Amino acid sequence: MSRSLKKGPFIADSLLTKIEKLNEKGDKQVIKTWSRASTIIPAMIGHTIAVHNGKQHVPIFISEQMVGHKLGEFAPTRTFRGHSKGDKKARR
């Protein structure tokens, strides 16, 4: 079920204040955040946000196509290393 339109999108307050400050200055710095649940808004376009994936911060450049999505969608938390090659017993 999606979020109510009456409430508006969720954005962490600390992240929103950092973006507003950078927009006032016209500065382009990498913003570190742990808030994967924050929704991308049009004010974030053109900024690079480093989203935490559980181990490190993954830098993400925000473009127009990303608006409305969550930050966590662009920072995968799991790495797939492939299936084991030499498992002969499982094939029989």
From Swiss-Prot:
InterPro entries: Ribosomal_uS19, Ribosomal_uS19_bac-type, Ribosomal_uS19_CS, Ribosomal_uS19_SF. One of its GO terms (biological process) is ribosomal small subunit assembly. Protein S19 forms a complex with S13 that binds strongly to the 16S ribosomal RNA. Keywords: Ribonucleoprotein, Ribosomal protein, RNA-binding, rRNA-binding. The keyword Transmembrane helix does not apply. One of its GO terms (cellular component) is small ribosomal subunit. It comes from Crocosphaera subtropica (strain ATCC 51142 / BH68). This is Small ribosomal subunit protein uS19. The lineage of its organism: Bacteria, Bacillati, Cyanobacteriota, Cyanophyceae, Oscillatoriophycideae. One of its GO terms (molecular function) is rRNA binding. Disulfide bonds: none annotated. Belongs to the universal ribosomal protein uS19 family.
